[in-house]
């Protein structure tokens, strides 16, 4: 026989609102942006919550218990709702406490957090020798600090760095093993994903909400048809418009960083802007030695060093913050980005070619004439020409680099004023007669 009847169950009547008040008085829980949050971070699986509610109710509520549990969870969303729960970027919530960016550590879980990593902070953790040796074998020495800073950057919910990372190789180097180790470091705060899907699917961004890191361990080689979704994730510094299938769009916090492993470059089919490439940290792996024998257990060995890897990544984060979120970038990494940019936009090579055009301060050429010279250059070099509008846009975007000036005051051969550029001279004379005028 029961000696105590809770306030939420009187005279055979179950009061859902009072139950939620009672539940929240003994549980640290809030609801925001479509998710429950606790001192352990975002509640990824609501089943443990449902089970606890079930155990509290089962002695008092008999019929339709499962349905009533669902109703309680829905009411709990209202009772625990907060208007906003912004990310906190000066600390890292860990399995045994909170590590602040200044290096101080507070034990315990006193507050509700957005993300908590499943790794303990141990200032005396041994150096991750397997991990460091793996990176030394995989990457050039000057690129290791960049990886250290990027992984550290992913520890906090911030996009101040404004960069994504692409690690490129020929295949077989073992670069995707990094993703296995990071899944141990970040736990449910990391997702496997696809850069291609993010670029194509307007619902894909919402899947990355509340996530610190998205890893594409085998990036597709096709050029992206559109880049605005990817760029918006890399640069988001606040709430953005997110959309889930069949639901109204809403404002949500987005701080997922993008890391891709690939055998090729991340290219855009139409976007040739400097911004698309400037947002990429592009690292190339060393060639795999023919004599190297791969260790099938290397991922497990490195994952076992996760506490030491945390200290290593935190050192990179502190360096990044000290440098104003400017990543350490080797000359090789900068050159990689320039090569990828040029590979997707041959206008740069055209402007630096000989025999077709000349950069000359007092010269001027119409946009149409320049484009025809460019098409001739492409044809004679077995290259595909971009469209006329894209060609003009590329010249305008880089006019300072080549000391050009866009103007609409060029006089063409017919005496009409047209658009063109000052500071460039055509050395060849393509046939500008329209096909319809020719005999």
Labelled PLM ranges:
Residues 24-42, 47-49, 85, 92-212, ...:
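P-loop NTPase catalytic core of nucleic-acid-dependent motor ATPases
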Residues 204-250:
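Conserved nucleotide-sensing/catalytic segment adjacent to the nucleotide-binding pocket
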Residues 1, 35-64:
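Short, small/acidic-rich helices and loops at N termini and domain boundaries
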Residues 52, 56, 178-181, 211, ...:
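Alpha-helical scaffold elements adjacent to nucleotide-binding pockets in ATP/GTP-utilizing enzyme cores
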Residues 8-11, 65-99:
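Extended, Lys/Arg-enriched charged tracts that mediate electrostatic binding to polyanionic substrates
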Residues 303-345:
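Phosphate-handling catalytic cores of nucleic-acid transaction enzymes
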Residues 1-27, 37, 42-45, 120-137, ...:
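Replication-associated primase and helicase/ATPase modules
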Residues 66, 70, 88, 186-188, ...:
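Positively charged interface segments
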